Design a protein with these regions (language model features):
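Bacterial N-terminal signal peptides that target proteins for export
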Residues: 2-13
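C-terminal segment of classical bacterial N-terminal signal peptides
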Residues: 15-26
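Secondary-structure junction/capping motif
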Residues: 5, 140, 185-186
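Intrinsically disordered, low-complexity regulatory segments in eukaryotic proteins
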Residues: 178-186, 195
Length: 195
């Protein structure tokens, strides 16, 4: 009898944990994270800059925000601008106009060869976009947000850091989705604890 009660209690805890994970997953489902490996060879055309960097972008369609974080070093020139370009004609290749703030992200470290940047943009504000991007994508911030988030999801957006040596961009990287655990994989992990 005690074994049956223990198993029943264990099953109850598994179900309770699955419900909690499902609730946590659904409350965070709107946030999607992307990563970019920034380098000169990723530019179009490629360049020989020894500069490197990483970018992380979290888009939240529910909160209408986009968090941008970048770390870079080893540039040959001093930074002049940074922003996200979108959409390219094909995923992972080509060039596109500036989609986000022009001439650069607010507060981006300019005149340096290495730095760190972190900002959360309110995507309901026109100041988060290049005005021509808004015009080309329906004329409202809502339509521009939808277009930009879709371009990022489609692999047609890249983070670019420009310098005085490479005005068209010294290092860039296309935004690719980060692998995130799903409710199904979390449920599988919970079940494996009781096998």
């Amino acid at each position: 009898m005690r074994t049956f009660v223990t198993k029943l209690l264990g099953l109850f805890l598994v179900v309770l944990a699955a419900i909690a994970i499902g609730a946590a997953g659904s409350s965070q489902a709107a946030v999607v994270s992307y990563f970019a490996n920034l380098s000169g060879p990723n530019e179009s055309p490629p360049n020989a800059s020894p500069g490197t960097g990483t970018g992380a972008v979290d888009v939240d369609a529910t909160a209408h925000t986009m968090h941008v974080h970048a770390v870079f070093s080893g540039l040959l020139g001093n930074t002049t601008a940074s922003h996200i370009h979108a959409p390219t004609a094909a995923p992972g290749t080509g060039t596109a106009g500036v989609a986000t703030t022009t001439p650069t992200f607010a507060g981006f470290p300019l005149g340096v060869m290495a730095g760190t940047y972190d900002i959360t943009l309110d995507m309901t504000l026109a100041s988060s976009y290049n005005p021509s991007y808004v015009t080309a994508n329906g004329g409202t911030t809502a339509s521009a947000e939808a277009a930009l988030f879709q371009s990022i999801a489609d692999g047609k957006a890249y983070l670019n850091i420009h310098s005085n040596v490479f005005p068209g961009g010294e290092i860039r990287g296309f935004l690719i989705p980060l692998a995130t655990p799903t409710t199904a994989t979390s449920w599988g992990r919970i079940k494996s604890l009781y096998r």
